[in-house]
Amino acid sequence: MTVLWFVSLILLISILLVAVKHSKRRWVRQPPSPPGLPIIGNLHQLGELPHQSLCKLSKKYGPVMLLKLGRVPTVIVSTPETAKQVLKDYDLHCCSRPSLEGTRKLSYNYLDIAFSRFDDYWKELRKLCVEELFCNKRINSIQPIKEAEMEKLIDSIAESASQKTLVNLSDTFLSLNVNVICKAVFGVNFQGTVLNNDKFQDLVHEALEMLGSFSASDFFPYVGWIVDWFTGLHARRERSVRDLDAFYEQMIDLHLQKNREESEDDFVDLLLRLEKEEAVLGYGKLTRNHIKAILMNILLGGINTSAITMTWAMAELIRNPRVMKKVQSEIRAQIGKNNKTRIISLDEINHLSYLNMVIKETCRLHPVAPLLVPREVISEFKINGYTIQPKTRLHVNVWAIGRDPEIWKDPEEFLPERFMDCDIDVKGQDYELLPFGSGRRICPAVYMGITTVEFGLANLLYHFDWKLPEGVAVEDIYMDEASGLTSHKKHDLLLVPVKSLV
């Protein structure tokens, strides 16, 4: 009888403890949330462009907003103050990444920099990339490659100018970055790969779509895969991964075959050397799949993001002739008389203050990753008095911050002068402008990305005047965004180059 009473007491205490635990959960003060639907929660409210839909919702529900996306609790922050709390004050509490099917596949089960969880492997890998790939020495070493590719591009555009034909700047900027990245990172010319230009661009676009496409598996972990099979997303994803893997293998084979005395070490050489030396990163040795995952980050991040920003910048400039004239006048006054073979250097670009303002304004209106890459909460913390619990996904709506009338006067207008006599920069310390993120998960290639955009724009604005195709007015320019992980211009930018006579 005594034993029975003792067991009953233990069970009663256990039940009470569970009840108290659940009671505490119920009374946790959570952020306000729009009403959702059964099963899908708030998924139907995201729309085609989630950052815009979430911006509208935040005006009603506040700067810290909780959504139930399928089975996944997701918090959206939409002001500089709340972004600072997430990215600085409580950075360590929410600097991991969620498990998403697209990123898992393309990153070889999270062996990369951008999408892997926060652990010792990620710390050491990021340190390696910052020190070896994105350091000033590496950036300076690829400048001759940039200049050589820019010379080819200027010659090509000059030919179009002489024939008065259109130039697709969306494709032009992407091709420029492809050629530079392939030479600087992989050590080969783009033409040395199995893919031609069009096929390669299709490969990059498809991979980015796979990263940004809606996957039911990401919101319904146990049954979502069935939906992905029926919609064909699973097959597309597998095909994209297979095509990218073939490209990585080709790059690696080329490095293993080439004469080391005739070529300078690039990043692939560095990774292959570490693999050969059985370098240890966090929880294990560097393997071939680690190398491919890192190459994925470089390929998709390095090529596409800068091209997107340059395209948006030129689109805004052609819509704002006053700004176009002003930035070209600055460049030409600083550099001097035009010359067919003249390429503007990085040192000269450092003196182009108005161009820098144009790029900041472009990043404000058109951040490449409008919701940044999602974070996952590791440990509980509070924002504005609201409790954010572990396993919650977290987005910073930098698109909403960039268009907040409480922060920016005339936020929908393209006004680079707003940055005159203003210390706000894009390097992650100013929470009003966060195109590259901030904190531990800030893009490690911020400087490389900025200099790439500056270099491309400065040279094309220096050598050419630009005008709209015949019969097209400024108001006819489509500025619609395409949906996905990155926010690129939905319609290609087609302009007519005119050789500058200045």
From Swiss-Prot:
The chain crosses the membrane at residues 1-21. Pfam families: p450 (PF00067). It is found in: Membrane. The keyword Phosphoprotein does not apply. The keyword NAD does not apply. It is a single-pass membrane protein. It comes from Arabidopsis thaliana (Mouse-ear cress). One of its GO terms (molecular function) is iron ion binding. Belongs to the cytochrome P450 family. This is Cytochrome P450 71B10. Its cofactor is heme. It comes from the Eukaryota. PANTHER family: CYTOCHROME P450 71A9-LIKE ISOFORM X1 (PTHR47955:SF19), CYTOCHROME P450 FAMILY 71 PROTEIN (PTHR47955).
